[in-house]
Amino acid sequence: NILGREAKCTNEVNGCPRIYNPVCGTDGVTYANECLLCMENKERQTPVLIQKSGPC
């Protein structure tokens, strides 16, 4: 039973694209897009996965 999938990071030097394509993290937080969730994981050293596409 898979809880979620790993967020894929792009190697964007300027940060994430400003595209609103929300994903729901396994931490119960809605992220504006997959890239932003991935960046948060990198900054906080957390293993949050994508629970589902769309807001939580």
Swiss-Prot record:
Q: Which UniProt keywords apply?
A: Disulfide bond, Protease inhibitor, Secreted, Serine protease inhibitor
What's an example of a GO molecular-function annotation for this chain? serine-type endopeptidase inhibitor activity
The entry's localization annotation reads:
Secreted
Which Pfam families would you find in this protein's record? Answer: Kazal_1 (PF00050)
Q: Which residues cross the membrane?
A: none
- CDD domains assigned: KAZAL_PSTI (cd01327)
Function of this protein? Serine protease inhibitor which exhibits anti-trypsin activity. In the pancreas, protects against trypsin-catalyzed premature activation of zymogens. In the male reproductive tract, binds to sperm heads where it modulates sperm capacitance by inhibiting calcium uptake and nitrogen oxide (NO) production.
PANTHER family from the entry? SERINE PROTEASE INHIBITOR, SERINE PROTEASE INHIBITOR KAZAL-TYPE 1
According to UniProt, the name of this protein is: Serine protease inhibitor Kazal-type 1
Q: What is the originating organism of this protein? A: Ovis aries
The gene for this chain is SPINK1
